[in-house]
Regions:
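Charged, terminal alpha-helix-loop-beta segments
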Residues: 1-129
Length: 129
C-alpha cells in the first residue's frame, strides 16, 4: 500500500512520518499501559547534518538538499497535536478509561519535540538534564 503524508498542505517526501507515528504509538502505548511514568516527554529527533561532509559537488548538492528538505518537512508537523491524536485514539479504541481527561491533558502538555543535529544534540541534552 502506498501512503502519502501531508502537513500544512505540503507532501512530506523525505521526513519519515510512518516511522514517527510508530515511535509515538510506542510512547503512547507505554503510558496507557502504565509502563512509563507520566512526566515530561522530550522527544529528540536526531538527524545527521551532512553539511561538513566532503562529497563530489553534485552528490553534496543532492545530500544537502535532502537534509534541508527533511528539516523543513519536520518543522511543518505539529508533533504535540499528532501525539494528542494518537494518545486519544489508543485510549478510546484500546485502553478505555485508564487515564482521566486531566491526566491526558497533563501528558500532552508535557510533550515536546526537538529536531537536533549531531552538533546541537549534546548541548540540548545538557539543557534538559
Amino acid at each position: 500500500m502506498d501512503i502519502e503524508y501531508f502537513s500544512c498542505g505540503e507532501k512530506l517526501e523525505h521526513f519519515d512520518m510512518k516511522q514517527m507515528i510508530c515511535h509515538l504509538l510506542g510512547i503512547a502505548t507505554g503510558i496507557l499501559k502504565k509502563e512509563f511514568e507520566q512526566k515530561q516527554i522530550d522527544f529528540i529527533y536526531l538527524l545527521y547534518d551532512p553539511t561538513e561532509l566532503e562529497l563530489a559537488a553534485d552528490t553534496k548538492e543532492l545530500v544537502d538538499s535532502i537534509y534541508e528538505r527533511t528539516c523543513y518537512e519536520c518543522n511543518l508537523v505539529d508533533f504535540a497535536t499528532l501525539f494528542h491524536v494518537i494518545l486519544t485514539f489508543l485510549k478510546e479504541e484500546r485502553y478505555g478509561d485508564v487515564l482521566s481527561n486531566e491526566e491526558m491533558e497533563k501528558i500532552i502538555y508535557s510533550f515536546t519535540f526537538t529536531l537536533a543535529s549531531q552538533e546541537f544534540y549534546p548541548m540540548f541534552l545538557q539543557s534538559i538534564t
